[in-house]
From Swiss-Prot:
GO molecular function: ATP binding; RNA binding; tyrosine-tRNA ligase activity
Quaternary state and interactors: Homodimer.
Family according to the record: Belongs to the class-I aminoacyl-tRNA synthetase family. TyrS type 1 subfamily.
Protein name, entry field: Tyrosine--tRNA ligase
Residues reported in the UniProt entry to bind L-tyrosine: Y36, Y170, Q174
SMART domains cross-referenced by the UniProt entry: S4 (SM00363)
Entry's Gene Ontology cellular component terms: cytosol
EC number annotated for this UniProt entry: 6.1.1.1
Pfam families: SYY_C-terminal, tRNA-synt_1b
Name of the gene encoding the protein in the UniProt record: tyrS
Taxonomic source organism: Staphylococcus carnosus (strain TM300)
EC top class named in words: ligase
Top-rank lineage group of the source organism: Bacteria
Role summary: Catalyzes the attachment of tyrosine to tRNA(Tyr) in a two-step reaction: tyrosine is first activated by ATP to form Tyr-AMP and then transferred to the acceptor end of tRNA(Tyr).
Catalytic activity as recorded in UniProt: tRNA(Tyr) + L-tyrosine + ATP = L-tyrosyl-tRNA(Tyr) + AMP + diphosphate + H(+)
Length: 420
């Protein structure tokens, strides 16, 4: 019998590799399965690069299965070599603990921690921290061959540049995690990114050797790529975080709304819970009326609503619409700061009041002659209001919070002018 969940994951392109497709399908059809996905606390917030495996785990929860979210308070002290060309810098214990708390607090946004399919949050420091070196070598190291470990991509790719024994053993620690969750919670499936294949299969092999456990499975999801070859998960401002203090809901909305036509349908399949019928409708809209950007709006709205809630989404849309229309009066001073923090910044003297002198000093127009032309031609807007009077004086009323003024030149060129 075809499993509907696996069928949906295949359609979305979310299954990159799996250890035993037939065995996994059988257990998903006959029982409620417990699965897990791990996140190492490399920062005090997750970023959008963490989303895909976690959203895939959430899809299993939506279909009646039980997710375990593992935060690597133990493995985070070591550092995963997978996907890295250089040795990681070790974090302090205090930093790891702070990061564990920060990431743990974000899991409420992604998983449901109530009901029959309630998610569980665990920290592998709780069991890895209790294993002595002698126990590690006798109880676990004895079951893992060095040749087997050397054959894994995560290790092989590092041999030329060097890999420390610390990072070399990471694979065994993750294998211990899978075994622990299997014994304590009857967890049978691990989900991870494509770079986790070696770590996942090592866990399955360790369980087979130590406990004779053959009912354990692994799924990896694809690396998220963009059609233009650029790295996914970065904006011009840098990493796109899930913490609203690091990346505001407005910035998150802008990140997704700017998705290209070449990527948007794939990202709708990856990052939203919209069904096949709706995504196919959006794909048709993209082909027939690309200027409406309906697919991009659906992507941005669904992700921001899921991560930050309806209120934050509405604020993000309101800021976006106000900036697009130039109606800045609709925005608060904080929203203006938020919306314009990435535009060119300039400083002018508080004593400069004439509009021509003002826009020259701010570098908005290259000369007084150019400035006079810009003003006379209606190309200059002060806080969203067109100003064509060459004698206009910048007043206190133009200084938002007595701190800055938003100036627009032409249709789209914005500047934030501050006072000194």
């Amino acid at each position: 019998m075809t499993n509907e969940l696996l069928k949906d994951l295949e359609w979305r392109g979310l299954i990159y590799q799996q250890t035993d497709a037939e065995g996994l399908e059988n257990i998903l059809n006959k029982e409620q399965v417990t699965l897990y996905c791990g996140v190492d606390p490399t920062a005090d917030s997750m970023h959008i690069g963490h989303l895909l495996p976690l959203l895939t785990l959430r899809r299993f929860q939506n279909h009646g299965h039980k997710p375990i979210v593992l935060i690597g308070g133990g493995t985070g002290m070591i550092g995963d070599p997978s996907g890295k060309t250089d040795e990681r810098v070790l974090q302090t214990e205090e930093q790891v603990e702070q990061n564990v708390r920060g990431i743990g607090n974000q899991m409420d946004k992604i998983f449901d921690f109530s009901g029959k399919e309630a998610a569980q949050l665990v920290n592998n420091r709780d069991w890895l921290g209790k294993i002595s070196l002698i126990d590690f070598l006798r109880d676990y190291g004895k079951h893992v061959g060095v040749n087997y470990m050397l054959g894994k991509d995560s290790v092989q790719s590092r041999l030329e540049n060097g890999i420390s024994y610390t990072e070399f053993t990471y694979m065994i620690l993750q294998a211990i995690d899978f075994g622990h969750l299997n014994r304590e919670y009857n967890c049978k499936v691990q989900i991870g990114g494509s770079d986790q294949w070696g770590n996942i299969t090592s866990g399955i092999e360790l369980m087979r050797r130590m406990y004779g456990q053959t009912e354990a499975y692994g799924i990896t999801i694809p690396l998220v790529t963009k059609a233009d070859g650029k790295k996914f998960g970065k904006s011009e401002a840098g990493t796109v975080w899930l913490d609203a203090e690091k990346t505001s809901p407005y910035e998150l909305y802008q990140f997704w709304i700017n998705t290209t036509d070449a990527d948007v349908i794939k990202f709708l399949k990856y990052f939203t819970f919209l069904d096949k019928e709706e995504i196919e409708r959006l794909e048709q809209s993209k082909e027939e009326a690309p200027h409406l950007r309906e697919a991009q709006k659906a992507l941005a709205e669904n992700v921001v609503r899921f991560i930050h809630g309806e209120g934050a989404l509405n604020d993000a849309i309101r800021i976006s619409e106000a900036l697009f229309s130039g109606d800045l009066k609709a925005l608060s001073s904080d929203e203006l700061r938020e919306g314009f923090k990435d535009v060119p910044q300039a400083e002018v003297s508080n004593a400069t009041t004439n509009i021509v002198d003002f826009i020259v000093e701010a570098g908005i127009s290259s000369s007084k002659r150019q400035a006079r032309e810009d003003v006379s031609n209606g190309a200059i807007y002060i806080n969203g209001e067109r100003e064509q009077d060459l004698k206009y004086e910048i007043s206190e009323a133009d200084k938002i919070d007595n701190e800055f003024t938003i100036v627009r030149r032409g249709k789209k060129k914005y500047f934030m002018v501050k006072y000194k």
